[in-house]
Amino acid sequence: GCSQFEPRDKRFYYRALWNFSLREDLAELDSEFNGVDFGHSNLYENLLLTGGQDVPAIEERARKQTIAFIATKPRLNPNEEAIAPTYMKLAWRAQNTFDEAHALHRATYDIAVSDEPEKDRAIRNVLAYYKDSAYAITSKRLDHHRLDQFPYSKAFRTRFPLFNATIWSYHYLQVAVYDPLQAARDLAAKTQAVRPILATYRRYLEQPPVQWTFMPLTAELSPQFAARYPELANIFDNLHMLHDNISDILTSERLPTWEAKRAEIYRVLNSYYLASADATNPMIVQGQEHHH
């Protein structure tokens, strides 16, 4: 186990009149995101407890638990600490990095759905609040291909293709809704606009897109959002790449002990993902556009 005690310096979410607009006004989308939160935590806990070696435990049991939870259409986001107590003890700082980025995702959906008249200003404010955190992921464009070339990279998608494609389906949903939400003028139109995406997402849950070779990217699925808010697009893509890295670390036998896994999670987080590393981060793409 891990004996080191980590201070839990959690921040409260950014307070605004638009808080919880998604939950109140577009509950069918909100409940899907609550299911996504469960899926990530349930995966990490099961990977850790099975040593990343037990294919049926992940591909069948843990994946089906997640699909069943999503099917209940949860009204509130789950307590991830209750779902993944072992993982939270192992790498709390990494989990808090996820939590703050997920709160940023939620805030941007709330703003998009709300009747807030100055949406750009609201997004600028919530982004500034996010960047003020010690757990902020860099808003610079990272070289995802280099970040996918560690010795243990691709271990998760190779061993667990179904759950990997399920995770990528979550990431599809998270970024595909931005352009339709922003283009639709009123709540009725927004509700209609996300329905085809929800239908595609639910189809992916039933038949995971195992043919995909890389995670979905914001600029591919919501190009107008990415052009308007490039820093947000980078943060969300980097968040999703960090998810892939941690899944690989938890799966790979190259890092046989929990201590080794924890050390590598924190090495990668501190060196390549946190905005606090921007001055020295070798994974930042300099200047040019970066496409997959």
Regions found by a protein language model. Give the residues of each.
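Polar/charged low-complexity regulatory segments
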Residues: 2-292
